């Protein structure tokens, strides 16, 4: 009996003095890689028994890991907050917070054709020239991809040139576009995208396009401004009316929408806003909430990464009590 008590006492001492390492899994947009690397370091410094593991992908692909593949994540961070209410709520999420903003630019290198001529007013004319190759991510996987399509279609309205989308996209891909009687446009992204590879460079998400651009595989890339800054790329800034970074232009943006035909999902062009949530099927929701709380407490991380923070963040839905004091309910 004494021996048994000693064994039990010894075992209890080991359990009391040890902490089990927990894994905090995050699915996030590729354009959030830089700020979330910093958030990971901050969180692990404050929580020594937690290993933060991040998976970067296009935001739509991130959501589908949860909704279609039933994978577990403690935090979902999207480059387009709207994929949360439109693809996850109410079954997979019941709240989200809007945390930062961005805009689209056209990145290039010193080897890009006509880089000494291109600007925010003539870029589409440069793209039409022989031998120029431009890249964008897949609309079916990545908000940056469908935002690129929106920008090119909006350009027809802004520059008063009805040939821009036709010559840059319709002539080189299997996308379609419908012009409605009210002057709005609906782009149709097919389930299986094909492109003219002599003119268009396509990859799943925008960060997959950076290496090939820097290796001079093509000339120009539609990319988030923050990502271009983080990677030291040269870029052309687009007018506010088409760069999707200006709240004041929201009404103009709304003239263009895109349908992802393989997903039965439609998105209207809106200002670029990033969103976070903790999925309902997360194995440890408190763990995810604690990470979101860190993000909300440190908006300067977004600012340092070139992504203007929304401070305080805007909360929508059944925001957890632990976060309510850090957000403005929208």
Swiss-Prot record:
It holds the Pfam family SBP_bac_11. One of its GO terms (molecular function) is tungstate binding. One of its GO terms (biological process) is molybdate ion transport. Keywords: Signal. Residues 1-13 form the signal peptide. Coiled coil: none annotated. Gene3D superfamilies: Periplasmic binding protein-like II. It comes from the Archaea. InterPro entries: ABC_trnspt_W-bd_WtpA (IPR022498), ModA/WtpA (IPR050682). The keyword Glycoprotein does not apply. Belongs to the bacterial solute-binding protein 1 family. WtpA subfamily. PANTHER family: MOLYBDATE-BINDING PERIPLASMIC PROTEIN (PTHR30632), MOLYBDATE_TUNGSTATE-BINDING PROTEIN WTPA (PTHR30632:SF16). This is Uncharacterized solute-binding protein Mevan_0954.
């Amino acid at each position: 009996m004494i021996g048994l008590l000693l064994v039990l006492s010894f075992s209890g001492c080991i359990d009391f003095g040890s902490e089990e390492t927990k894994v905090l899994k995050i699915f996030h947009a590729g354009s959030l890689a830089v700020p979330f690397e910093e958030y990971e370091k901050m969180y692990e410094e404050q929580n020594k028994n937690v290993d933060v593991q991040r998976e970067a992908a296009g935001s739509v692909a991130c959501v589908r890991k949860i909704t279609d593949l039933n994978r577990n994540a403690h935090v979902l961070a999207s480059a387009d907050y709207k994929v949360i209410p439109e693809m996850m709520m109410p079954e997979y999420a019941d709240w989200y917070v809007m945390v930062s903003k961005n805009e689209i630019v056209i990145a290039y290198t010193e080897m890009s054709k006509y880089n000494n001529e291109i600007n925010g007013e003539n870029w589409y004319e440069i793209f039409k020239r022989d031998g120029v190759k431009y890249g964008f991510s897949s609309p079916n996987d990545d908000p940056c991809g469908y935002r690129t399509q929106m920008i090119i279609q909006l350009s027809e309205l802004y520059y008063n040139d009805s040939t821009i989308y036709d010559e840059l996209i319709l002539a080189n891909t299997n996308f379609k576009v419908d012009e409605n009687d009210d002057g709005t446009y609906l782009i149709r992204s097919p389930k299986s995208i094909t492109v003219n590879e002599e003119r268009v460079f396509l990859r799943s998400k925008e960060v997959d396009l950076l290496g090939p651009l820097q290796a001079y595989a093509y000339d120009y890339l539609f990319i988030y401004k923050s990502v271009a800054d983080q990677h030291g790329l040269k870029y052309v800034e687009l007018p506010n009316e088409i760069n999707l970074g200006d709240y004041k232009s929201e009404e103009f943006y709304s003239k263009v929408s895109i349908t992802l035909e393989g997903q039965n999902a439609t998105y209207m062009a809106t200002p670029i806003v990033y969103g976070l949530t903790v999925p309902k099927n997360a194995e440890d929701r408190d763990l995810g909430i604690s990470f979101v709380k860190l993000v909300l407490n440190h908006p300067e991380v977004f600012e340092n990464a070139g992504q203007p923070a929304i401070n305080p963040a805007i909360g929508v839905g059944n925001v957890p009590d632990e976060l309510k004091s850090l957000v403005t309910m929208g």
